[in-house]
Amino acid sequence: MSVTREEAIERLLAHYQEPYRCAERPATASPELAATAFMHLVSDRKILSLAKVGIVESDDFVYIYSVEELTPEVFDRCCTAALTDAFKRVDPNPNHNFSLVSVFFICDKVAPETTAAVKKMKYHKDYENPEHGWVDLRLAAVEVGGGTRCANPMGTVLLNIYQASVN
């Protein structure tokens, strides 16, 4: 069953709707950015599962880009924009555990050189103090016609989310 880019984005947003704050076509964004979904999770920090000793904060910033053809130039521009926006949102305080920047590219066509770039792209940042956490980049690019599906090492979970949500 083949779906359009718009249908795929709607189904992905439906997946993220419950625990995330979702927005379609953010006003200040690039034309390729179709939707965003942000989650901030606060949970208890415990010792031996008994004594509460503080809290732990984690974030997931999801950016869904819709492009006709994913070229290396578009890929670089969108990844830079997503990371820049996510870093404005991260608060690396002593309770911050980790943040994930998850970037979906929903495409009609993925250029072969872009497939290699997606698979090789790695980004990890540790904050100055170990207790202030870290940030990782997860990437996935999918041709909606059933063709290419690729991800970086951290982004394979995004392909599973796409598979469960869209197909």
Stretches found by the model and what they are:
Residues N93-A117, E143:
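Nucleic-acid nuclease catalytic cores
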Residues K120-N167:
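Charged, structured surface patches that assemble and position nucleic-acid processing machinery
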Residues S58-F61, F98-V101, L137:
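Short, surface-exposed beta-edge/turn micro-motifs
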Residues D76-A81, T115-K122:
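"Short basic amphipathic alpha-helical interaction patches in structured regions
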Residues E73, A111-A116, C150-A151:
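Switch/connector loops and helix/strand junctions flanking conserved nucleotide-binding motifs
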Residues D59-R89:
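A broadly used, surface-exposed interaction patch
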Residues K52-I55, V90-N95:
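Short, flexible, solvent-exposed loop/turn segments with mixed acidic/basic and small polar residues
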